[in-house]
Each structure stands twice: as C-alpha cells, then as structure tokens.
C-alpha cells in the first residue's frame, strides 16, 4: 500500500510543484506591479475572503466529509446508486454556493466592513485609508463569485481523487495562476487601477478550472445532471459530517482571517508582508503536507470501511514520517534563509529591499509552525476518514480561543509579526490535540521507529542549519546584485541539501525505507 501512496504522492507533489512555481511567478508579477502598497493590501484582502470560503467548501470541510461517504457508496459497486449520489451532491452544493456567491456580491460592502474594520472606520472618518474600503468593496464583487466555480471544481476533484485519478485535480490550480498572470500583463496596462485586472484573473480562473475538469469527470462516467437532493440519505450524511467539520478543519483559515482583521488596523503593508511570507510557507505546505493529506484520506477511508485497523495505523505512521522528513528541514530553511529567499524571488519593481526585510520577519514566525501545519493536514484525516467530525470541532474551538489569546499577547508589542507567531502557536496546539485525541481513542499511536526516525531528521536538520549559517556569515545579501544573490542562495541551498542528505545516509536511511510502513 505504501508503494501506491508514494506513487500517488509523487504525482500530486509534481503537479503541485508546477502549480506552486507558477504561483510564485504570479506573486512576482503582483510584487512588481504593486509591491506592498495600498492597492496590494486591498487585492490580497479581496482575494482572501473567497479563498477562505474555498477552503471550507472545496478543500476543507466538504472534501473531508464527502470523500469518506463517496468511498462507502463506491465500495457497494452499485453504479446507479453512485451516479444518483453524485447528482444529488452536485445539485445541492451547486445551489448553495451560487446563492452564497450572489449574496456575497450584493453585500460586499458589509463583508469589507466586517473583516476590514480598520479601513471602514477610516472611511467613516474621511481618513486617507478610507479609500481602501471603497476599493476593497468593489474588488470583492469581482472575486466573490470564484467561490461558486471552485467549489464545484473541488467536488469534481474529490470524485477523481477517490477513483485514484490524482493528477487532474493537482494540476488544476496551475490554470488559475496562468489566468492571473495573463490578466496582469494584458488587462492591467489598460486599467486605471491595475489591481482590478488581478481580480478579473481570479474570476476567469475559476471558470477555466471547472471547465478543465469536466471532460475527465465525463470519461469516468460520473458527469451527471445535477439534482437538488437535500433529503437524499447520502447528502444528509455528508451534511451531518460537514456542519461540524466546517469549523474543525478550517481553524487555520479562520485564524488567518482574524489576522487580516487585526492587520487592517496596523500600518500600511502589514497585510502584504503577511501575504508574501504566507505564500512562501504555502509552497512546502502544499507540495508536501497537502499532497500527502490528499492521497491519505481515500486510503484511510478504505482502511476504515474494510475494518483494517493495522493498515490504518500503518498508513498514519507513514504520513507522519513523510511530513517530518520534509517539514522539519523546510521549516529550518525558510526560517534561516527568509530574507534571501524573499529578496531573490520578489525584489524588483515596487517590491523593495525594505519590503523583503519586513516580510522576512513574519516568514520566520510562520516557519516555526510549518511542521505543525503539515501535521494538522495528515492527522485530521484520521478523524474524518472514520466519519468522526465532532472531536476536531472541540479541538478547533480550543485552538480558536487560543489564537485570539495569542493575538492579544503578541500583536500589541510585535504588530504583524505577532500575528504570525500567534498563528504558528495555535497550529502547534491544534496538531498536539489532534494527536492526543487519536491516541486516546486508540486509533493511532506513533511508533518507536517513527520517533527514532524523527530524531535522526532533527539531528540532520541541525547540521544543515550549521551549514547555512557558515555559508551566510559575513554576506551582506541586500548589497548584492540579483545575479550574485541567486548564486549565493543556490550554493547555500545545495550545501544544505547535501549536508542534510549526507547525515540521513550516515544514519542508514535509504529511499527504499519509505516504500514500507515500517523500517
């Protein structure tokens, strides 16, 4: 089974890598166009709201609730029942998200006032930042319909993933990045406010992503006519699982939204600095954490349906090993090379050396929580695959409260950096509580072999950090030209990878070990 997981994981990771690279290209284009100016803050705000809902409907609670039920129905091998279930789910979800999108467009000023309260207060008091409120309200009308298209895309992708067709859904985000980049180059020069071109890129990207997946769904024989099915037994089961999961699986996104709310009261640039650092954090998180979580959920669901407790625990252990192997060194690399990485990728046009420096502080704080973010992604399926959504909700409530407390403690003295620290701490608490819950339910307890493996990874990472510090000592990175920056950063990363890999090799760890559940 682990060989199949590795193959599926590599497929998802490869497609995700392509998407993340294009995502970085997109962010470079945005940084060059707007840097960390007011318009950039507004676009990131207008894009964050529908993206928050996307994570709930398309990637978060819906997928966690839908895939286990779909796996159960698919296991019955009744094609007609399967098609009817898909028709009712797609019809019900489609109606809900299109109505949600319409309401969002109509009340966009209210949404902006709610989550951008700092701008709204300035608007009421005729202060300069009040213009951000008007711009954000107008831009949100364009970006909000994205939620409808991407939710149906998420449904299609979940169906294909359940059928072990992972490549299509993993490739789909590439199209959004292409659309945003194209609009930035083709539409922005013709607009008085270039940020609107990016908003239209999001809207068009949603349509293109859905259109891309439909032919693959047709080939799978599951492109059926949507029907309203609120009382369909399968839909009722998905609803029952999804309602609590809406909160439990999206704690991290809710925390980021709270960060945006607080950041609207901080100095101009705060939202942009958090955005750019979050984007770099999302690169390893998506490439490794989300990729592993994507392939593990259908597998765990099948283990649960087949009452394979040993297989369930073994696959969970494999997932924890993989995110530890990738997450620990990635977190250290991002933390100790934050400013050089931001400078090489983004520093051009309106994105200055000062912007890179400011964003590097929040990236360091986010990097501290990277492993926790990844662990949450792979531990949560341990609940949802067993159709247990209540426990993550209880954990989510505690983590939400903790994040608010951490924000109060750290945001006042440290500003936007404090928001990133609070998010990382709440993610760490989330991962710890998820694991404690699984162990108490006797579903999964980390094995001794995995603990030993993690210790070896941590030691290797310490050696890697020493190599990074040695390479970077005495280097005034901000004073280098771009070519020299690229050479310096590349050599540092190559040495770091070589030291990390060499240490693992000296500990007797080989590639073949990841093809089995125990080693």
Task: Locate the predicted segments by residue.
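Membrane-embedded alpha-helical bundles of multi-pass transporters/translocases
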Residues: 1-519
């Amino acid at each position: 089974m682990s060989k199949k997981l590795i193959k599926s994981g590599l497929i998802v990771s490869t497609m995700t890598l392509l998407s993340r690279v294009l995502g970085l290209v997109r962010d470079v284009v945005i940084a060059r166009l707007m840097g960390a100016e007011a318009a950039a803050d507004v676009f990131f705000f207008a894009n964050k709201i529908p993206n928050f809902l996307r994570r709930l409907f398309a990637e978060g609670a819906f997928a966690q609730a839908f895939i286990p039920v779909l796996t159960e129905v698919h296991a019955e091998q009744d094609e007609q029942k399967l098609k009817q279930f898909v028709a009712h789910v797609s019809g019900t979800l489609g109606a809900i998200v299109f109505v949600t999108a319409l309401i969002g467009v109509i009340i966009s000023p209210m949404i902006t006032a709610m989550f951008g309260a700092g701008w709204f207060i300035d608007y009421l008091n005729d202060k300069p930042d009040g213009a951000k409120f008007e711009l954000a309200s107008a831009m949100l009308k364009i970006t909000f319909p994205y939620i409808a298209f991407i939710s149906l895309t998420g449904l299609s992708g979940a169906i294909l993933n359940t059928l072990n067709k992972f490549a299509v859904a993993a490739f789909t985000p590439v199209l959004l990045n292409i659309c945003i980049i194209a609009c930035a180059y083709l539409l922005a020069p013709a607009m008085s406010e270039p940020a609107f071109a990016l908003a239209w890129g999001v809207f068009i990207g949603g349509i293109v992503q859905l259109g891309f997946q439909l032919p693959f769904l047709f080939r799978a024989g599951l492109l059926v006519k949507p029907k309203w099915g609120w009382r369909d037994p399968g839909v009722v089961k998905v609803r029952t699982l999804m309602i609590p999961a809406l909160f439990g699986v999206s704690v991290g996104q809710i925390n980021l939204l709270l960060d945006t709310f607080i950041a609207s009261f901080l100095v101009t640039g705060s939202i942009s600095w958090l955005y750019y650092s979050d984007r770099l954090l999302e690169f390893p998180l998506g490439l490794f954490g989300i990729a592993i979580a994507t392939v593990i959920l259908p597998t765990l669901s099948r283990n649960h349906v087949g009452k394979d407790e040993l297989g369930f625990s073994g696959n969970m252990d494999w997932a924890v090993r993989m995110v530890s192997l990738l997450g620990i060194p990635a977190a250290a690399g991002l933390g100790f090379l934050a400013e050089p990485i931001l400078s090489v990728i983004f520093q051009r046009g309106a994105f200055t050396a000062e912007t890179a420096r400011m964003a590097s502080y929040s990236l360091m704080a986010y990097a501290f929580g990277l492993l926790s973010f990844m662990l949450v992604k792979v531990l949560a399926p341990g609940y949802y695959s067993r159709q247990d959504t209540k426990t993550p909700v209880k954990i989510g409530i505690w983590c939400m409260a903790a994040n608010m407390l951490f924000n109060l403690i750290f945001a006042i003295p440290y500003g936007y950096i404090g928001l990133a620290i609070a998010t990382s701490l709440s993610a760490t608490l989330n991962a710890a509580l998820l694991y404690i819950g699984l162990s108490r339910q006797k579903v999964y307890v980390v094995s001794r072999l995995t603990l030993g493996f993690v210790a070896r990874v941590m030691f290797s990472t310490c050696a890697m950090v020493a190599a990074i510090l040695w390479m970077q000592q005495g280097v005034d990175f901000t004073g280098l030209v771009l070519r020299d920056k690229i050479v310096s950063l590349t050599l540092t990363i190559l040495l770091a990878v070589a030291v990390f890999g060499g240490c693992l090799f000296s500990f007797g760890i080989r590639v073949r070990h990841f093809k089995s559940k125990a080693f």
